[in-house]
């Protein structure tokens, strides 16, 4: 009888475990780093330290470095470029560039949200309007 009860309890646990589904956790507002040089990493750190926004989408900071001229920094949201700048290796006006990038990115995100709300083009693909 005890053996029979153990089998029933074990079967109950297996059926209960089979009905459980993992809950997918979404982390809103990620800021990802796709930089490769030291100036790019410094820009990402300075930008992310000062970034205080309630934006729930994901931002990506990309870099195309040049050994001679510096780095081309691009900030994108869902593959849409919202800010671009050129950074010199000597960090000339570095803090001003970071603050300017923060202001321009925030304005671009606000404009983007307004455009999405006003241009309700749900039946069109992104490249059709």
UniProtKB/Swiss-Prot annotation:
Pfam families: CsgE (PF10627). Residues 1-22 form the signal peptide. Keywords: Signal. GO terms for biological process: curli assembly; protein secretion by the type VIII secretion system; protein transmembrane transport; single-species biofilm formation. The keyword Signal applies. InterPro entries: Curli_CsgE. GO terms for cellular component: cell outer membrane; curli secretion complex. It comes from the Bacteria. GO terms for molecular function: identical protein binding. The keyword Signal applies. May be involved in the biogenesis of curli organelles. This is Curli production assembly/transport component CsgE. It comes from Escherichia coli (strain K12).
């Amino acid at each position: 009888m005890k053996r029979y009860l153990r089998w029933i309890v074990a079967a109950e646990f297996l059926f209960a475990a089979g009905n459980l589904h993992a809950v997918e956790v979404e982390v809103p507002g990620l800021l990802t780093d796709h930089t490769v040089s030291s100036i790019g990493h410094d820009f990402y750190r300075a930008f992310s330290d000062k970034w205080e926004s309630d934006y729930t989408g994901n931002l990506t900071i990309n870099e195309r470095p040049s050994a001679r001229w510096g780095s081309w920094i691009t900030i994108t949201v869902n593959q849409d470029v919202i800010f671009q700048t050129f950074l010199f290796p000597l960090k000339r006006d570095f803090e001003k560039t970071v603050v300017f990038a923060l202001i321009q990115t925030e304005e671009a995100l606000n404009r983007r949200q307004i455009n999405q709300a006003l241009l309700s083009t749900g039946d069109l693909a992104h490249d059709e309007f």
